């Protein structure tokens, strides 16, 4: 293995593990994380996430519930696939699509002046230029991972 291919492999591993860990953490905050809330709010984590999704004022309530119940599980699976490296191209593409969708929704909310939690990792994560910069960077990393995973496939074909 040449030095440039070692570097690309190291970058690929770093990107997939970092993005995977972020997705697993994001899922955890929506599935099991007990966040501070007033004693009178007996809400489950998915119900708190549903409130964040509803804050975007984009979906009907039935769709909000569906998203709040399923998206964290999808994030968890994608995160674990990235960390393990299984189905890397598919996981990388799913990550880029998810982050692209999240980023578009956040830009829309920010442009409309909505002061709402982004829904990324808890209710204290209000959409701001900082969250846009962070999620834009994550999207760029996911797109780089897609390119690297496709490059890895084409290199494997050329060695046959």
At which residue positions do the language-model features occur?
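Membrane-interface extramembranous regions
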Residues: 1-77, 84-160
